[in-house]
Every structure is written in C-alpha cells, then in structure tokens.
C-alpha cells in the first residue's frame, strides 16, 4: 500500500491510480497490486456501485423466499401488540398478493385462471396500530411504501391533491423506478373522511367525498396512471411516466366513528312474522367486539359507495386498546418507547428506570385522551422534557427514576448521582 508521502523503494517515481489516473499526492491512499494501483476514492465508488446493484436485485432475488403467513404474523408481533385477528387477515392477504405477483407471472399463458387483487380495508379506533401494521408489512417485504391522507384528496380540477399524486409519492420513495413502484404498497389513511355527506344526491357537487371515491376506484382496481417525471407539473407537451397500478397493494384505513352504532342497529332489527328471530339488545359489547360483526352493507350505510367497498374485499377490524395493552406497548415491542428512551439516556451514560406504576399511569392518561397508542409518546415527552433539557449539563448523574407521581405531575423525576448515596429530585421551574 502506498500513502501520499510514501518515498521508500519508489523514491522519485510518482505513482498513479490505474482507474482514475490521480497521482499518489491527490488521494489519501493508493493500494498496490500486481503492476496496478487503485486509490481510496475508486474503492468507495466501486462499493457504491455494488451496493446499488444488490439493492436493485433484492426483490427478484428474494422472489423464492416470500415469507409465509405465520412468519409474517410473527414479524408483526415484534412491532404491534395484540390485534391477532387483524394480523392473521393481513398476513394471508399480503402473502396471496405477492405470491400472485412472484409466482403467478411465471406461469402466465399456461394457466387461464387470472388471480384478482385483494386490497385491504383496516377499520379500528385511532391509535390502534393501523398505520404501523402497513409500515411493518412494507419493511418486511422490502417494497416501496407511501402513506396518503384521504382528507387532502379532491376530484381532478379542484383545489387539493389529485389521486394520481399518491402514485407520484410512491415513485419518489423508489427514486422513480417504475418497476419497483408497481409492486409497492400504498396506505390511504382517514378513508372514512371521504364518505359521502348524505344518502341523497344533491345539486352541490361533493368533490372531497363521493367524488374522491369515484376517482380512487380505477386507481385501486388497476389502471395506467400518468405521472409527471420527477414531480413536475402536468402540461400537454410533457412526457409522462406510465405506472400500472394493477399490482400495487392498496391498504385503506380509518377509525369510522359511529360505525358500531350502524352495526348494532342492523343486528338488532328483527324480522316480521311467526318465524322471525327475536334479537335482544346487547349493550355489553365494546366497540371492537361490535366491529367484528361488520358487513359491507354497513360501510355503504356509513357513506362509502358500493363500488368502492367492492374494491376492498379484505376487511380487518382492530380492537380498542385497553390499559393492559397500552402498558405492553410501552414496554415490549422492538421499538417500544421505554427502549427508545433507554437508548437516548444511555447516550448520556445515564440509566433510566420507569417504574411499573409509572407505565400504568401513562396508559391511564392515554385512555382518558382517547388517542390510543398514538398519544403515548406525547405524554412521555411532556414528562421527561425538563430532565432531557437539564441532563446534558449535569455531572455525575448515573440514573433517572420515574414513578407514577411524576406522570401525574405531583413531583419531578428523581436523579441519582454517582458520587453520592442520596437521590436528588430535579427542581421544578
């Protein structure tokens, strides 16, 4: 190996990289081989090229290693607590979808049976894990993934986002590689917010409700979407990227507030006549249990048009998270909040100790706010804000203790100093 200032046996002879032609004085390192030399810059460039090729070929290379439903569900268990029924539905639907893409295409022409696409609808309360389930699936399958907010969508020609912007976002996630985008996953959040405003047609055009549902129909079912290259604006002389959406898996999610009442009304209606089944009102069921009885007709009554419901044949319902589930979410998943804060404090060489009663108090606060798991981080951030602000300036702190009184705002976190047996509370401002 030759360095910039190397003047041993090659004293007086200037060495050059055989690839880029730079001299030994222009680079940090020059590696010698049999009659050839390569500099550190060319080595880095070669590594980048090889890394890009490996990433590009990963989906094809893993084509025969598609995870089976049990493995998919097990991976979801690492990140999402509970929701076993939803995980099972998702695992089977996703497995069949990508099996259709990876195996079905190889047999095209030999078999006349054409497998249809099974898009998915997730129905569950806010903070129950709908978005996290979709994100984890995309990461597991190593496919492009994007999240779209249905509330920002409008019909083409109106102020707001065009539905084709969804495909543009997906392309951005994979550097405008059309082939990769065509096997991606799109999660459309807040899908319940585009329900039509009333059952009766109105003179006033519903551009953000039924109009958006109509616009999404073809996109979800499968069409050729024209997308401007590199996110430019559309104009007549421009060449568009043509993206076939027939192999893109669409997962729609929404809280559907009030849907449980529609389900109860339907299930409590009795028939007419002597043979009619008499049904009594069951007020003991919670929202999650009621949603398990969901039928497509309930979604139509809620405000989704029948054609749109038909494009989402796989329906998975998520349970409302109780206190025990929220405590488990705080502690057990791979990326749990307790583990994340432990890592943050570890960077300051400080141990953080969340007592069991503290985690229960956090869960209780989240239940009062009705934000599900989504509200847990906000509560933790507020509690630890002052400590994280002052800790980098403190010396000899080895441990921070958080109990239920800290969560309730009755006291500050306890700081334990290494040079003293005493524990000193952080003074409140």
Swiss-Prot record:
ATP binds at residues 125-132. PROSITE patterns: CLPX_ZB. It comes from Teredinibacter turnerae (strain ATCC 39867 / T7901). This is ATP-dependent Clp protease ATP-binding subunit ClpX. GO terms for biological process: cell division; proteolysis involved in protein catabolic process. Zn(2+) binds at residues 17, 20, 39, 42. One of its GO terms (molecular function) is unfolded protein binding. GO terms for cellular component: HslUV protease complex. ATP-dependent specificity component of the Clp protease. It directs the protease to specific substrates. Can perform chaperone functions in the absence of ClpP. It holds the Pfam family zf-C4_ClpX. The keyword Metal-binding applies. Belongs to the ClpX chaperone family. Keywords: ATP-binding, Chaperone, Metal-binding, Nucleotide-binding, Zinc. The keyword Nucleotide-binding applies. Residues 5-58 form the ClpX-type ZB domain. Component of the ClpX-ClpP complex. Forms a hexameric ring that, in the presence of ATP, binds to fourteen ClpP subunits assembled into a disk-like structure with a central cavity, resembling the structure of eukaryotic proteasomes.
């Amino acid at each position: 190996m030759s360095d910039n200032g190397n003047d041993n046996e090659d004293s007086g002879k200037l060495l050059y990289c055989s690839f880029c032609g730079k001299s030994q004085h222009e680079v940090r390192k020059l590696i010698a081989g049999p009659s050839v030399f390569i500099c550190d810059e060319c080595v880095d460039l070669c590594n980048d090229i090889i890394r890009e090729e490996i990433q590009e070929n990963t989906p094809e290379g893993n084509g025969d290693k598609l995870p089976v439903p049990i493995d998919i569900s097990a991976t979801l268990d690492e990140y999402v607590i509970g929701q076993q029924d939803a995980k099972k539905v998702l695992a089977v639907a996703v497995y069949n979808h990508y099996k259709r893409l990876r195996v079905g295409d190889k047999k095209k022409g030999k078999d006349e049976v054409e497998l249809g696409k099974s898009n998915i609808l997730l129905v569950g309360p806010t903070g129950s894990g709908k978005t996290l389930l979709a994100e984890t699936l995309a990461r597991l399958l190593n496919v492009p993934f994007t999240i779209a907010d249905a509330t920002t969508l409008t019909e083409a020609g109106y102020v707001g986002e065009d539905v084709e912007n969804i495909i543009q976002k997906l392309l951005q996630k994979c550097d405008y590689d059309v082939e990769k985008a065509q096997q991606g996953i799109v999660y459309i959040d807040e899908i319940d917010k585009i329900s039509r405003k009333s059952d009766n047609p109105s003179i006033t055009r519903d551009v953000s409700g039924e109009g958006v549902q109509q616009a999404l129909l073809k996109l979800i079912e499968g069409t050729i979407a024209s997308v401007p290259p590199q996110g430019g604006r559309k104009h007549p002389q421009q060449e568009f990227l043509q993206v076939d959406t027939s192999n893109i898996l669409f997962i729609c999610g929404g809280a559907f507030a009030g849907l449980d009442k529609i389900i109860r009304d339907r299930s409590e209606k009795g028939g007419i006549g002597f043979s009619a089944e008499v049904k009594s009102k069951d007020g003991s069921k919670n929202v999650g249990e009621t949603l398990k009885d969901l039928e497509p007709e309930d979604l139509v009554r809620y405000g989704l048009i029948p054609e749109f419901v038909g494009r989402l044949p796989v329906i998975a319902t998520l349970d409302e998270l109780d206190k025990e589930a929220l405590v488990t979410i705080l502690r057990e998943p791979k990326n749990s909040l307790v583990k994340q804060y432990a890592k943050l404090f570890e960077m300051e060489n400080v141990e953080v100790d969340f007592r069991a009663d503290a985690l229960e108090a956090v869960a209780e606060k989240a239940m009062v706010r009705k934000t599900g798991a989504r509200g847990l981080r906000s509560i933790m951030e507020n509690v630890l804000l002052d400590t994280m602000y002052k800790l980098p300036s403190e010396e000899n702190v080895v441990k921070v203790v958080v109990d239920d009184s800290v969560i309730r705002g009755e006291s500050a976190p306890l700081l334990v100093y290494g040079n003293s047996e005493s524990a000193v509370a952080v003074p409140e401002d």
